[in-house]
Design a protein with these regions (language model features):
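Terminal, low-structured helical/coil segments at or just beyond the last alpha-helical repeat
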Residues: 32, 186-188, 200, 204-216, ...
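Residue-level recognition of tetratricopeptide repeat
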Residues: 116, 150, 154-157, 212, ...
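"A position-specific structural signal for the A-helix of alpha-solenoid helical repeats
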Residues: 77, 113, 147, 209, ...
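N-terminal leader/linker segments that initiate helical-solenoid repeat arrays
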Residues: 25-109, 294-297
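Short solvent-exposed coil/turn linkers within tandem alpha-helical repeat scaffolds
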Residues: 100-107, 136-142, 161, 182-201, ...
């Protein structure tokens, strides 16, 4: 899956559940001091127009190693070539490959592709499990760590088991992705502008994930700069409206009502299911700013 479609998919996946609890969150913003949990389970859009091989992480066939066997190499290449128009079929192929070749040198690439496929089909537990295995094998896979750091806190709800443990893992992945992404070497033949965009796409997800981790921990003043950075460096034509919504919410929680209204208005200007929620958020933030004392930044 391309980086832009990956980011859009994550936004679509969360937009519905964020909309569902937005009104309650505003009502409770000055009562509980804690982030409201959303409801997961909405089926995400599967991006029907993806190109074959557009998996989210290219299956790099090692060229500097002798082939283990021709059958394994052929199976890996066949998996790489599978389009994302039938994700259940692609997932089955990846799982079958790993069962047949449990020690394959292609495991990191297959794991990475499965992470994105599982997220797109809302198999989040499998995504998190296979993502952990991928990072254990390839600790410099910044893209996988970034998407996990963003998805883990967005998928949490009131019934999430061991929420603090999950938040800690997301925080670790986000910080690690932010640390190593600027140091990654440019692949041979990749144009400079594409490389910069790819790195910014990864950093956008990582800062978004870290910001939401802090938000769920009640560290709103720490969440704000992370979410601001996520919006600032987003290489897509328009930023993820979910990040603008979260930035507005974090500013409301921190009693920065003017800044909250600005973020909500930017969110409301973008098409999507969060438009009305953010429009209402901007109006509510303005009312709160007129009746309550704003905290200094």
């Amino acid at each position: 899956m391309s980086s832009s479609k990956k980011n859009a998919m994550t936004a679509i996946f969360l937009a519905g559940c964020l909309t569902a609890f937005a009104t309650t969150a505003f009502a409770q913003s000055n009562q509980t001091g804690q982030p409201t949990q959303g409801q997961s389970g909405q089926q995400p859009n599967t991006n029907k127009d993806q190109k074959p091989g557009d998996t989210g992480s290219s299956l790099e066939i090692p060229t500097n190693q002798p082939p283990v066997n021709a059958e394994e190499d052929a199976a890996a290449k066949a998996f790489q070539a599978m389009p994302n128009t039938d994700l259940p079929k692609k997932i089955t192929a990846g799982e079958d490959f790993l069962k047949k070749y449990p020690e394959s040198r292609y495991r990191p690439a297959v794991y990475s592709a499965l992470v994105f496929a599982y997220i797109q089909t809302n198999n989040l537990d499998k995504a998190f499990d296979i993502g952990d295995k991928e990072v254990a094998l390839k600790p410099d896979d910044a893209q996988t760590m970034a998407v996990l750091s963003q998805t883990i806190p967005r998928a949490m709800n009131a019934s999430t088991q061991e929420p603090q443990k999950r938040l800690a893992k997301a925080e670790t992945y986000a910080k690690r992705a932010i640390e190593i992404t600027p140091t990654l070497p440019k692949p041979e033949g990749m144009p400079d502008q594409n490389f910069v965009a790819a790195k910014n796409e990864t950093l956008t997800m990582a800062h978004s994930g870290l910001g939401l981790v802090y938000f769920r921990m009640g560290k709103y003043n720490d969440a704000i700069p992370e979410l601001e950075q996520s919006v600032k460096i987003d290489p897509n034509p328009a930023p993820d409206p979910v990040n603008l919504y979260l930035l507005g919410m974090a500013n409301v929680k921190a009693s920065h009502f003017d800044e909250a209204a600005i973020a909500f208005n930017k969110c409301a200007a973008l098409p999507g299911s969060l438009q009305n929620t953010c429009k209402n958020g901007a109006e509510e933030a303005k009312k709160q700013g007129a009746t309550q004392l704003s905290a200094p930044k």
